[in-house]
Each structure stands twice: as structure tokens, then as C-alpha cells.
Curated annotation (Swiss-Prot):
This is Putative transcriptional regulatory protein NedR. Residues 1-25 are annotated as: Disordered. GO terms for molecular function: DNA binding. The gene is nedR. Gene3D superfamilies: GntR ligand-binding domain-like (1.20.120.530). InterPro entries: GntR_C (IPR011711), TF_FadR/GntR_C (IPR008920). Residues 9-25 have a biased composition (Polar residues). Keywords: DNA-binding, Transcription, Transcription regulation.
């Protein structure tokens, strides 16, 4: 599968979000997602915060689903993230890892590898889980 055949995401209780083939709705988003992922890596490499770019990436990723509820839930997550993120001890390497994992999401989707996409999405959340664990232990 490639960007030409694109992705939508279904819900599976055992796998979380899972990619499934659909129309070519992501073709028009590939360049934007790639640019956002690159910008996140650049910001993280400079030790700068990329939360707004991260937010834009996730909203752009979900747009082709055509599901307003998913977009609203994604936006709600980012409102919570904006409140919680400053209270977490985020290490500079966490930011870079997160940014690189956004790039991995784009690369896996572009390559048409559903397993790599599932893995990239799951791996993407590891740094935030680590930050939350640090905050809870403090």
C-alpha cells in the first residue's frame, strides 16, 4: 500500500488504531505531514519546544478521515497537553525521540507498511509515557 492508495484508521480493541486501505485522501497531506515532521525534528535538535507543530501534525494526520469527532477529540487532547506538558519533566532527548517518531509515522505510511505504521504510532507515545511516569514518581 502507498500514499496513492492511502490510509484510514479503524478501531480494533486489541490493536488500537489500525491502518486500513482507502481512497487517495492522504496524497494531498503527505507533503504537509513531512514538512511538519521535519520542523519538529529541527526544533527538537535545537532544544526548542515543538508542541504547536506536534498539534498541527496530529490534526493534519486525522483530517482525511473526515470524522469531526476524531478531530474534536484530537483537539481536546492538545488542550489538555498544553496544560499538562509544562508540569512534566521532559528531557531534551525525549523531544528529539518524539520528533523522530513523527518522521517514522510519515515514512511508514509513505512506504505502505501497515505493521511499521502501527509500530511507529505505538512507539510515538513512549516519551510522553516516560515523562508521566517521572512526574508520578516525583
Amino acid at each position: 500500500m502507498c500514499w496513492g492508495r492511502s490510509w484510514t484508521f479503524g478501531r480494533s480493541s486489541s490493536k488500537g488504531w489500525r491502518p486500513t486501505s482507502s481512497a487517495s485522501s492522504y496524497d494531498e497531506h503527505r507533503a504537509d505531514l513531512s514538512t511538519l515532521a521535519d520542523e519538529m525534528v529541527d526544533l527538537a535538535s535545537q532544544g526548542r519546544d515543538g508542541l504547536e507543530v506536534d498539534r498541527a501534525f496530529h490534526l493534519k494526520l486525522m483530517e482525511p478521515l473526515g470524522n469531526d469527532l476524531i478531530l474534536q477529540l484530537t483537539e481536546a487532547f492538545w488542550q489538555v497537553q498544553a496544560i499538562v506538558a509544562p508540569t512534566l519533566r521532559t528531557e531534551p532527548e525525549d523531544r528529539l525521540i518524539t520528533a523522530q517518531r513523527h518522521r517514522a509515522i510519515v515514512d511508514a505510511a509513505t512506504a505502505g507498511d501497515p505493521e511499521a505504521l502501527r509500530s511507529a504510532i505505538a512507539d510515538h507515545y513512549a516519551p510522553i509515557r516516560t515523562s508521566i511516569a517521572r512526574a508520578v514518581q516525583s
